[in-house]
Amino acid sequence: GIDYIAASFIRDGKAVEEIRELCVLNGGEHVTIFPKIECALGVENFDEILEASDGIMVARGDLGIEIAPQLVPHIQKEIIRKCNDAYKPVITATQMLDSMQHNPRPTRAEVADVANAIYDGTDAVMLSGESAAGMYPVEAVKMQASIALETEKYLADHAPLVVPEGASTTRAVNNVVGLSAVNMATTIGAKCITVPTTTGRTARLISHFRPNMPICAFSRHEWAVQQMIMYWGVQPHLAAITQGTVNGTIMKAIETAKELGYVNPGELTVATAGDPRMCVQAEGKFSSTNVAYVAQVR
């Protein structure tokens, strides 16, 4: 089965809901839908599209044809900001390293374009013609990856903790625990944040605070692991972490993180988990993550 659908020329939220209904009817309830924002109506109705979707793709090629190209940069920034505030992943795509279809090295402007999308908060950058039909597909992938790694290294050293709009005042327990975990990990110098998760939701929330250490996430569901690949800073692993108790689950997750090399004996990690006996219910919804745990690895 597939993991994602990138839906072209989405104009409103209803179109996303129709795609989701088709997925569910055909056994694809875990398929994530990324509408491609590439027309004027998609921009105009963006808020309802974002509400209905699992993430967004900024498809700048057609968008720059459908609307004035000089409007694309600030629309891109606004879309990324809104996705960050909604804790939903965003992909920036099209013509990022376009000259590498014919040349082994990008222009400096293209390098800056990729880096600036990452500075703005994009979760992923995507190649299209460069890797699909270009003369240097492998070189293009390696170049984009190297730009991303260097940019993230700079952000880890210089950028402050990112707090999406409303996150510091929200009373949603999942968000509060996620932000607290990142604050603790940053303050104590933790080597990683360890996240046992069923659906990947907690990893997604923590991802959007942009911590400067890896988010080591474990799920027993392959579909959840595949989805978490798209989240900024998350290193997802397929593993049966859940034990009979919350403490047992946390200890198993930390031990697995140690085995994978994310944290060594004597170093610190912060783990999140959910204790179902004390889950907080508000407005008819359960907050599944209600524990943040500091541990020194043995």
Language-model regions: role of each:
Residues 1-298:
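Non-catalytic helical/linker scaffolds that mediate oligomerization, partner binding
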